[in-house]
């Protein structure tokens, strides 16, 4: 069992989703997911309790990011106050003592000059050489001018050579 503080949160990337991460990794996690906005809900002393709370909340919130929608900024507006209350009211009473009081919305701006219209994923196993103009970075994705996107995280361990002009 990981005996370090863990946070259960709501993040808005392609849609509102629930997640859990170590307290020390919170902003890194949200940025990796391409979250535009995020908010802490609960703080637990260990991963196990946080995971149990997340399972409860997965009954009313997704725990997956729709990466294509996230990259295309294709999302609806949400009311954070309503969604937070919905989440907290759904939890069993014995979890209420873990609520993060006065939690604020954290907002992120990603450097994207061109939002892709039709996302094409770059697969380095199929396409050994790719040339493109970088137009943005969002979450773990590099976005190129021709709507090609490269998922850096899913290519961990792959040797890549980048040339800039």
Locations of the language-model features?
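Non-catalytic accessory segments flanking enzymatic or RNA/DNA-binding domains
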Residues: 1-165
């Amino acid at each position: 069992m990981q005996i370090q503080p863990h946070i259960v949160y709501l993040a808005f990337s392609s849609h509102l989703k629930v997640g859990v991460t170590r307290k020390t990794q919170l902003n890194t996690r949200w940025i990796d997911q391409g979250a535009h906005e995020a908010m802490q809900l609960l703080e637990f002393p260990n991963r196990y309790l946080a995971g149990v709370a997340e399972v409860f909340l997965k009954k009313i919130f997704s725990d997956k990011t729709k990466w294509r929608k996230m990259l295309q900024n294709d999302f609806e507006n949400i009311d954070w106050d309503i969604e937070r209350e919905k989440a907290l009211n759904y939890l069993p009473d014995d979890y209420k003592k873990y609520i993060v009081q006065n939690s604020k919305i954290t907002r992120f701006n990603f450097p994207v000059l061109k939002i892709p219209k039709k996302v094409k994923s770059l697969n380095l196993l199929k396409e050994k050489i790719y040339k493109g103009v970088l137009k943005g970075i969002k979450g773990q994705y590099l976005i190129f001018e021709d709507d090609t996107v490269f998922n850096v995280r899913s290519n961990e361990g792959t040797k890549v050579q980048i040339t800039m002009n």
